[in-house]
Structure formats: C-alpha cells, structure tokens
C-alpha cells in the first residue's frame, strides 16, 4: 500500500486564492472535489505545511499502474490501498483496471471523492464498488485489516535484497507492505509507530513506482 500519499483534494486554506478560484471555475467543480496538483497549483502551495510532500497525484498514478498491471493483482493475491496525506484511505476492487491516462485517472479519483461525500461508490461498466474512499488513519486501517506483519520500505530500514524481502513477505500469513507515496522525505511517526519492521531494497532513494514494481516482481518470482 502507498502511505501518506501526495493525493488529496484542494485544502480549504487555498480555496480563497484568486488562482484557485479561476481554476475551479474552469473545471466547474467544488474545490473540495478537485485534486491538489503542483503542476497547476505551485504558487498557491508555497505556504502549505509540508508542501514538498504534497500535490503529486501523478506519482500515485505511476505506482498504482505498476501494481494494477501485474499477475499478482490479476490472481487476487494483492489488495491495493492508498493512505493519503490527510488521512483518507482509498481501496481498489480486485476487478479494477485503472486508466493509463493521468487525466482520466485524476478525473476518476475526483469523482470518487465527490461520490464519497454522499457515501456512494463509483461503479464501472463491468464492475461495481471499484473505488471506495473513507476517512481513516493508517493506524485505523492496520487495526481493521489485522496484518500479521507491517513492513515499511524506506532508506532508513535494514538493507536487504529483493529476494530476502520476498521471502519475508511470503513466509508471513497476512503481510502488509507500506511504500511512501510522497516525493521527498521519510515516514512520519504516524506511520513508523505501526510498522513491524523497516527494510530497504537499495542504498539510494528510489521512486515509489520503482519500489512497487521491483517488490511485486520479486514476490511473484518467489511464488513460482
């Protein structure tokens, strides 16, 4: 799962900015249903707390595509969650096929946030309950899902090979793997306090989509 992901709707403190008002008028949407995106809102983000960790839904999209297009997901051996910076959890149905286009993905997530305010779910052509969004902390998600281990992948963790990590994962009854869904920094205490262990698969910092792809591939190899 991606944790503290840089995926959120426009924070309330930005709504009154002229540039934001123009942007949401152009999109004809409520600001609470528009994704914060540094590509469009850089100037307005300068005064935000933790601005360097926020407003990168494209990074989340890349990582989700790496997970969604895998045999591990196709065979229902992988459950995808995204925990966001502002404590929402997005759960993806096993039948979902995420769009390759970022703009289509952003529109889908914006629609999901809009529907979640009415406690509804998005329905697809061939599936229902494809995306579910709820207000939930990482701690609450761990309590709800009751994983046997929670492994955080971070450069602060013990350096091990991909094959060693995959063996740790497949030897656990119900493992959860946490990957940082932000462009800079490390897990905050609201994540690290609930990790069973911290591991690193490379001496250098890697993008979330690279970590996701390599980890899933190593697990698939170990399961053969």
Labelled PLM ranges:
Residues 9-10, 89-90, 159-161, 185-187, ...:
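Eukaryotic short linear interaction motifs
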Residues 183-224:
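Structured adenosyl-cofactor binding patch, chiefly the S-adenosyl-L-methionine
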Residues 166-170, 210:
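RNase H-like, Mg2+-dependent phosphodiesterase core
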Residues 13-15, 164-165, 190-193:
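Short coil/turn segments at secondary-structure boundaries
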Residues 147-148, 173, 195-196:
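Short, well-ordered alpha-helix to beta-strand connector turns
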Residues 134, 154-163, 172-186:
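Long, charge-patterned amphipathic alpha-helical coiled-coil/hairpin "stalk" segments used as oligomerization
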Residues 1-157, 220-221:
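RNA substrate-binding interface of SAM-dependent RNA methyltransferases
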Residues 64, 153, 177-178, 198:
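Structural signal for hydrophobic/aromatic residues that build the beta-strand cores
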């Amino acid at each position: 799962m991606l944790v503290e992901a840089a995926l959120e709707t426009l924070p309330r403190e930005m709504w009154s900015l002229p540039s934001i008002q123009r942007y949401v008028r152009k999109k004809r949407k409520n600001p609470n249903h528009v994704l914060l995106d540094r590509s469009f809102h850089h100037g307005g983000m300068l005064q935000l707390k933790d601005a360097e960790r926020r407003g990168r839904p494209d990074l989340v999209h890349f990582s989700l595509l790496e997970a969604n297009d895998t045999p591990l997901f196709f065979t229902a051996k992988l459950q995808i969650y995204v925990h966001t910076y502002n404590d929402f959890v997005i759960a993806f149905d096993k039948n979902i096929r995420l769009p390759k286009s970022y703009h289509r993905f952003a529109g889908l997530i914006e629609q999901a946030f809009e529907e979640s305010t009415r406690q509804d779910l998005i329905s697809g052509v061939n599936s229902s309950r494809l995306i579910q969004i709820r207000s939930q902390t990482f701690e609450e998600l761990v309590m709800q899902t009751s994983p046997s281990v929670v492994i955080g992948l971070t450069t602060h963790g013990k350096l091990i090979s991909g094959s060693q990590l995959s063996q740790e994962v497949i030897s656990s009854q119900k493992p959860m793997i946490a990957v940082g869904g932000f462009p800079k920094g490390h897990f905050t205490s609201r994540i690290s306090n609930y990790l069973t262990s911290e591991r690193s698969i490379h001496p250098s910092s890697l993008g979330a989509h690279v970590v996701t792809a390599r980890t899933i591939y190593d697990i698939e190899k170990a399961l053969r």
